Amino acid sequence: VVHELRARIRELGVRLGKYAPGAKNAITDVSGVRVGQCTVRRGASGPRGSGVARTGVTAILPRGPQTFHERVYAGCFVLSGAGEVTGLTQVAEWGLVETPILLTSTLAVGRVVDATVKYMLRHFPTIGGEHEVIIPVVGECDDSWLNDVASHPIEDAHVFEALESAGDGPVAEGCVGAGTGMMSFDFAGGVGTSSRMLPGGYAVGVLVVSNFGRLADLRVDGVPVGQLLAPRFEGTERRAHVHGSIVAAVATDAP
């Protein structure tokens, strides 16, 4: 597979916001945060039931491998949400997160939760004994327009790969990891990340999985790009339901 390197939006001269990005312009500019991904691609485009896989897993480790022993303060916010994030009730109640945060396909949530528990027990065998049980934080978006979700392509090994490959370097974006089969504004969507450096030397980083919107609604820095491009894509097949969703993780080292 040949991956074409594409410019990020700031490299094209578009400047969003008043603060400068960090060195990587990624959530990993926040000290301690690591990100790992596993992309699952199988088969050519085909009808439901053909076993085509366009999916994956994205893992965010707030404090790297020590997230369980070094819990971080956390909160949550839901706007018109109809999706699922496991463990969110505990986060809201305790104000803490003690597991990696994983993102994946809607019908893979159960598998990813189970695999994450296996991973955590392997690394922290005192869970359920000396220490309390855990509820992994796993969020989802629906990639069923490009991915044959009924074939259950996500396996434990994919979750382990995402977790074990997590690093603090640049983060791959676009159709990778959990974003592999996502659509945004009728184009390929996927994973996106950015960061901003604040006065005092603090960093704020964001990672999203984007899976929503119609072409006509696409704007870039206020410019109605979608409306300008629409004539080029007349007659192009599009998914019927575009309400979709977006999942975002925000990290900061500010006090």
Residue ranges: model-predicted function:
Residues V2-P255:
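A structural signal for small-residue-enriched, beta-sheet-centric alpha/beta enzyme cores
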